Amino acid sequence: MMVSYVVSVRFISGFVFGAGSGIAALKLYLYEEEKTDSESSVHRLIERFGLPQTGAETRFYINHILSYDQSRRTPRWVAEHLSGQRLQGQADRKHCKFKPDPKIPELFTARNEDYLRSGWSRGHMAPAGDNKISEQAMAETFYLSNIVPQNYENNAGFWNRLEIYCRDLTLRFSDVWLVSGPLLLPQVREDGRRIVSYQLIGEDDVAVPTHLYKVILAQKDSTLALGAFVVPNAPIGFERPLTDFQVSLSDLERMSGLTFFPEVDRAEQLKNLCEVDSCQLMDFTQFTLYISGRKVKSARTLARLEKVMTELRDAGITPDDYLTNLYLEKKRELVEKEKKPEQ
């Protein structure tokens, strides 16, 4: 009889404890539900007429993706993917014109007039040279949503050489991903204060970046190599190697407020691009030959063609076989063209 009594007490105690716990859990659940409903009601009231919009949502184009900074009238970041195949094509930039991006509200867009006589060039973040795959893809790189005010010498020189290096990486890697954009970094004053100061151009107050960044992620088989670079928006001579401007990815993320390639396992996968590859940009002679080749291709008269070759010789540079053959082919083309009106 005593055993039966003990079992009954234990059963009842367990039942009461379990029931009590269940009631407590139910009360907690109902409280949380009520709290959530109350918060939702408050949130709905706050959101009644909408919340502020930054316009920083991801925008997709044929061959690049970007996020736009409406307050500064420049991109926050521009992302691309390069491969040997995707760099092929016949699109020509002579058919493209800089213009406001139709996807950007008129109130927040930059205009060509902002750059006119400003002392700054219109610098591509996704370069036209990466987009020969189609006329439309190249034309979209001329939208001002992909453009920042850039120092002329930097745009035509160091930054151009960096873009060429990125394209050349597709000869050694199967896939190359790029993220490029502007930075506004502080300068240290004499009194030790760190001050962010930057110029605005045009009636639309387009922000002139103090620096530009480019993050390169290259893949070959299972190898992933990354390099992050921060470049002053100023002239940079041929004596400065690219590695002078290499920074850690975490430092760039701190400067920019962006997280790059979040799906990559950095601890396990990433190698230093400049250790896996050369990070070697074209030197003066190589770059001059490259630019001369572009001028030869675009020459429309024999006089212009000969001027290109004369300038090259005056610089003390001997044309390589590629440029010599390109010159002879272009010369034959222009001679035939000048003969036609006489026939």
Regions found by a protein language model. Give the residues of each.
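Domain-level detector for secreted/extracellular nuclease and nuclease-toxin modules, and
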Residues: M2-Q343
